């Protein structure tokens, strides 16, 4: 049995997670280089090896986990050039012929986007409602983003990542695909186009709950500098992943660091029907 060290729910010692000995469909050879716990049974397995059923207990057959071929098809697309800095060019070939992106790349891009989506928001409400995408994950409201209609059309073409009609909701595992594709294709304009308006959640614990799905080893380790207020702390966590020069992501919290205590006054609400959860959810 192999084990990894995963980030605990709170600052403290690492928690060992025992993995299945072999995942034959993935280059990881059983080592969950980018673990996922998206199964309802809470077992953890490699993000790139996500089977249709949990390899530990067989659950998930009814609602289907994301087949690994979708992930291979997604990561096979080339990254944009130079602005990616040190994250460009780290690729591995999976044994079944699919490209398997080096985990550091996925961790950086998915994590940063997940944080932006988690805290929040829609900055341009004029003319944007028809392009707003309400994002849900694990049955809970996670926020909303305003997408240019061409980008929205691109994401719809991913085959279910976003529903083309109605509320345009990304549900469950497709959320990860949507976020990943968004960053890969628009990484150097994302922060300018979708700056964060206000914290979506009123506590750091709510943010950790979402980030725990990515299981970054040591992500909430004891060496983390402390800031007063939620926005400052989130900005600090993001910089731990994207500080290297030339990464291509401007700091999305730059204009809002002086509002660090805003969530204490508003409870995370922004007054926008797109950034605040609808009643009944």
UniProtKB/Swiss-Prot annotation:
One GO MF annotation is: zinc ion binding
Keywords tagged on the record: Metal-binding, Zinc, Zinc-finger
Name used for this protein in its record: Putative zinc-binding protein ORF11
Organism name: Ictalurid herpesvirus 1 (strain Auburn)
Give the classification, highest ranks.
Viruses, Duplodnaviria, Heunggongvirae, Peploviricota, Herviviricetes
Gene that specifies this protein: ORF11
């Amino acid at each position: 049995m192999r084990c990894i060290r995963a980030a605990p729910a709170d600052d403290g010692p690492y928690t060992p997670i025992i993995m299945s000995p072999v995942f034959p469909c993935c280059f990881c050879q059983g080592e969950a280089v980018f673990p996922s716990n998206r199964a309802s049974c809470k077992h953890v397995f490699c993000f790139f090896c996500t089977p249709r059923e949990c390899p530990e207990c067989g659950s998930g057959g009814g609602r289907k986990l994301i087949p690994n071929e979708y992930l291979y098809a997604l990561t096979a697309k080339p990254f944009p050039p130079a602005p990616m800095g040190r994250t460009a060019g780290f690729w591995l070939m999976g044994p079944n012929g699919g490209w398997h992106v080096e985990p550091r790349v996925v961790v950086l891009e998915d994590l940063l986007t997940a944080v932006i989506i988690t805290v929040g928001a829609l900055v341009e409400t004029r003319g944007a409602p028809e392009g707003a995408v309400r994002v849900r994950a694990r049955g809970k409201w996670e926020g909303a983003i305003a997408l240019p209609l061409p980008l929205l059309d691109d994401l719809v073409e991913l085959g279910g990542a976003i529903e083309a009609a109605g509320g345009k909701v990304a549900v469950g595992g497709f959320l990860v695909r949507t976020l990943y594709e968004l960053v890969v294709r628009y990484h150097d304009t994302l922060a300018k186009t979708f700056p964060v308006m206000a914290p979506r959640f009123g506590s750091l614990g709510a943010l950790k709950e979402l980030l725990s799905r990515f299981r970054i080893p040591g992500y909430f380790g004891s060496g983390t500098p402390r800031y007063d207020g939620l926005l400052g702390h989130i900005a600090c966590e993001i910089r731990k992943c994207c500080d290297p020069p030339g990464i291509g992501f401007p700091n999305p919290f730059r204009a809002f660091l002086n509002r660090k205590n805003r969530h204490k006054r508003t409870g995370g609400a922004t007054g926008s029907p797109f950034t605040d959860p609808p009643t009944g959810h």
